[in-house]
Design a protein with these regions (language model features):
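Terminal, low-structured helical/coil segments at or just beyond the last alpha-helical repeat
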Residues: 6, 94-138
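Helix-start (N-cap) detector for alpha-helical repeat units in TPR-like alpha-solenoids
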Residues: 6-7, 40-41, 74-75, 107-109
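Register position in tetratricopeptide repeats
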Residues: 18-19, 52-53, 86-87, 116-123
């Protein structure tokens, strides 16, 4: 029964993610992972979902657990590199970039993705400062 249930949860998680219901997909991927903790595909998709909503620390944990099961997933290294960059773990990010590229990821594309994430982070910091300034003025 749990064999079929984990797959049902996983597939519902995928469909939820495709529909833009990322928080819902996280729930389903977590339920699926509890039933099938040794499945790297579940953990990878959990990482992608966390990354999508900006929960980079949780995403890193999921990608790391996925890579413990299957260390040949260049996408997991690439996504984890992006997450590490976002939380200013640049040494770890660079290490994962090198590993992803060694496994076939396109270096220019990955570096561009990291650059975009860093730009987004800077914009968020600026916006946060503006909001705080406005709150203090009111």
């Amino acid at each position: 029964m749990s064999q079929e249930l984990w797959k049902s949860y996983f597939n519902t998680g995928l469909e939820s993610a495709k529909a833009g219901m990322v928080e819902t997909s996280i729930d389903y991927f977590e339920w699926s992972a509890k039933l099938k903790p040794d499945n790297q595909e579940i953990l990878y998709n959990l990482g992608v979902s966390y990354m999508t909503i900006g929960k980079m620390t949780e995403a890193i944990k999921a990608f790391t657990n996925s890579l413990k099961i299957d260390d040949t997933n260049s996408d997991a290294y690439a996504n984890r590199a992006i997450c590490f960059s976002y939380i200013d773990e640049n040494g770890k990010s660079l290490s994962d970039v090198k590993q992803a590229v060694k496994m076939g990821a396109v270096e220019a594309g990955l570096k561009q993705a990291i650059k975009l994430v860093e730009e987004k982070k800077l914009k968020e910091k600026k916006l946060s400062k503006i909001k705080k300034k406005n709150e203090n003025n009111n």
